[in-house]
Amino acid sequence: MTKWYNNAAHEHLPAMCQKGILTEIEIIEDLVDEMNAAGQKAAITEATYKALYAQKRLMVVANAVTKKSIPDIEMEVDSELEKEHLAFLIAENKLTTTREALRAAQSRLDAWRSLAAGYRSAGG
C-alpha cells in the first residue's frame, strides 16, 4: 500500500502542532494584556470626551446671546473638542483592532488543536 503523505513531515507533526499551539497561546496571552490596556484607555478617553462634550455644550447654550439651533451648538462644541474626539476614536480603533487580532489568534489556535486531534485520531 502506498502512503499518500510525506512520512518525514508526518513524523514531525506532533512537535509542529505542540510548537504551534504554544506559540499561539503566548500570542493570545500578550493580546489579552494588550486588549485590557486598550479597553481601559478607550473607556477613559470616552468618558473624558463625553464629559467635556456635555460641559462645553452647556457652556455654549448658557453663553449664547441668541437662541442657537442644535446643529449650530454641536458644530461649535465639536470644533472645540477635536483633539479629545480624535483621541477617543483612536483608542476605540485600537481596542477593535486588538480584539480582531485576538480572534484571529484564537482561530489559529483552534486550527492547530484540530490538526493535533486529527493526527491522534488517525493513529499518529
Each language-model region and where it sits:
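Long amphipathic alpha-helical coiled-coil segments
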Residues: 39-42, 46, 86-119
